[in-house]
UniProtKB/Swiss-Prot annotation:
Pathway note: Porphyrin-containing compound metabolism; chlorophyll biosynthesis
EC number: 1.3.1.83
Annotated protein name in UniProt: Geranylgeranyl diphosphate reductase
Catalytic reaction list: phytyl diphosphate + 3 NADP(+) = geranylgeranyl diphosphate + 3 NADPH + 3 H(+)
Keyword tags: Chlorophyll biosynthesis, NADP, Oxidoreductase, Photosynthesis
Purpose: Catalyzes the stepwise hydrogenation of geranylgeraniol to phytol during chlorophyll A (ChlA) biosynthesis.
Biological processes annotated in GO: chlorophyll biosynthetic process; photosynthesis
Gene Ontology molecular function, alphabetical: FAD binding; geranylgeranyl diphosphate reductase activity; geranylgeranyl reductase activity; monooxygenase activity
InterPro entries: BchP_ChlP_pln/prok (IPR010253), FAD-bd (IPR002938), FAD/NAD-bd_sf (IPR036188), Geranylgeranyl_Rdtase_fam (IPR011777), Geranylgeranyl_Rdtase_pln/cyn (IPR011774), Geranylgeranyl_reductase (IPR050407)
Family named by the database record: Belongs to the geranylgeranyl reductase family. ChlP subfamily.
Pfam families: FAD_binding_3
Length: 407
């Protein structure tokens, strides 16, 4: 037999899973409803992803080596002093990154289907296949032609509003809303953001997250995020970041407006039967930073590697217990990272006073090094005891001063 796997969702998660599966000789189908989709996304990727996922230089629009943190009272702190010459945060456009990864998987033998999966039939017997009902958009006009596909395993990589998650009753999660405008700036204004990204904090831009100005290929992404309880305020919060960054954005032209949900924690069930969720569908976005691209691709790769290993390169059908090995490995490897970022968000995004403290803390070289090393290489990097004591003292001092600094 040859194992058949359907991967639903053609973003970084889905394509990364498909690539691993097809290399192992597994019959792999990759569904993407919109092949030219420009998904709303800040577009930041860590340095480790470039090498780990073998991304070519042209995928990266900008190499950010400087970050400016801006407090509620508009105190600016420049960070990035600890970066080495060859270290940077990559900024990319999702339509470019997604297209590259999907095409690479297709060239290896993945069957890419331009289609929308509407329904997943769950088999009554463990030995029976899953049936996907989908609209094939390559034929049948705008609505597509309804078709079915039977497979042994399904990977749900179809984002925060995952239909696959609903089909397996994976449970819900709390989420944030991100709103972003792509703005094309005059040449002199764009030059300011050549290697620079900005993060703004304050109640005026987000009561529980942050706002950003990230450089792209020929424009900047200007956006903000907040928890779903505040989603009615999202346009007012966007106006807040536009006001805070107004002088730097003068003469800019809005070329695209985007919004999307950001999961705030993993779903209660990420594997049910022979269906596994990865990326945003599973809830792998980090708190504090809201980063999702790397963890989406990494979770999908780990899931696919588990399928390859437990199926003996596609010679047997893996069980639910087999697929759950991926979850155990994931939680063991990254659980500490998620915990630390959750604590940071709870402590420092609460009030303008704590946000002032957060920005002040970011001026410390030891804090910068710890933060960038953890972000660039996706590990919680332990500091030596003396440095840790210094950071702890700095944190307490900044929190105490925060009330005085807040506007």
């Amino acid at each position: 037999m040859v194992l058949r796997v359907a991967v639903v969702g053609g973003g970084p998660a889905g394509s990364s899973a498909a690539e691993i599966l097809v290399k192992a000789g597994i019959e792999t189908y990759l569904f993407e409803r919109k092949l030219d989709n420009a998904k709303p996304c800040g577009g930041a990727i860590p340095l480790c992803m470039v090498d780990e996922f073998d991304l070519p230089p042209e995928i990266i629009d900008r190499r950010v080596r400087k970050m400016k943190m801006i407090s509620p009272s508009n105190i600016e702190v420049n960070i990035g002093q600890t970066l080495k010459d060859d270290e940077y945060i990559g900024m990319c456009r999702r339509e470019v990154l997604d297209g590259f990864l999907r095409e690479r998987a297709e060239k290896l033998g993945t069957k890419v289907i331009n289609g929308t999966v509407y329904k997943l039939d769950i088999p009554s017997k463990d030995s029976d296949p899953y049936t996907l009902h989908y609209a094939d958009h390559s034929v049948g006009g705008t609505t597509g032609e309804m078709k079915i596909l039977k497979v042994d395993v399904v990977i749900g990589a179809d984002g925060a509003n995952s239909r696959i998650a609903k089909a397996i009753d994976a449970g819900d999660y709390n989420y944030a809303i991100a709103f972003q405008e792509r703005i094309r700036l005059p040449e002199d204004k764009m030059a300011y953001y050549d290697e620079l990204a900005e993060m703004y904090v304050g109640d005026d831009v987000s009561p529980d997250f942050y706002a950003w100005v990230f450089p792209k290929y020929d424009h900047v992404a200007v956006g903000t995020g907040t928890m779903k309880v505040n989603k009615a305020r999202i346009k007012d919060l966007q106006a807040g970041i536009r006001t805070r960054a107004a002088k730097k954005l003068e003469g800019g032209e809005i070329i695209k407006v985007e919004a999307h949900p950001i999961p705030e924690h993993p779903r209660p069930r990420r594997v049910v039967g022979r269906v596994a969720l990865v990326g945003d569908a599973a809830g792998t976005v980090t708190k504090s930073s809201g980063e999702g691209i790397y963890f989406a691709a990494k979770s999908a790769r780990m899931c696919a590697e588990t399928i390859v290993a437990t199926s003996n390169n596609g010679q047997r059908v893996p069980t639910e217990a087999d697929l759950k090995q991926y979850i155990k490995q994931w939680d063991k490897r990254y659980g500490a990272t998620y915990l630390v970022l959750d604590i940071l968000q709870r402590v420092f995004y609460r009030t303008d006073a704590t946000r002032e403290a957060f920005v002040e803390m970011c001026s410390d070289i030891d804090v910068q090094k710890l933060t960038f090393d953890s972000y660039l290489y996706k590990t919680v990097v332990p500091a030596n005891p003396l440095v840790q004591m210094k950071i702890t003292a700095k944190t307490i001092g900044s929190l105490l001063r925060g009330n005085a600094l807040a506007p």
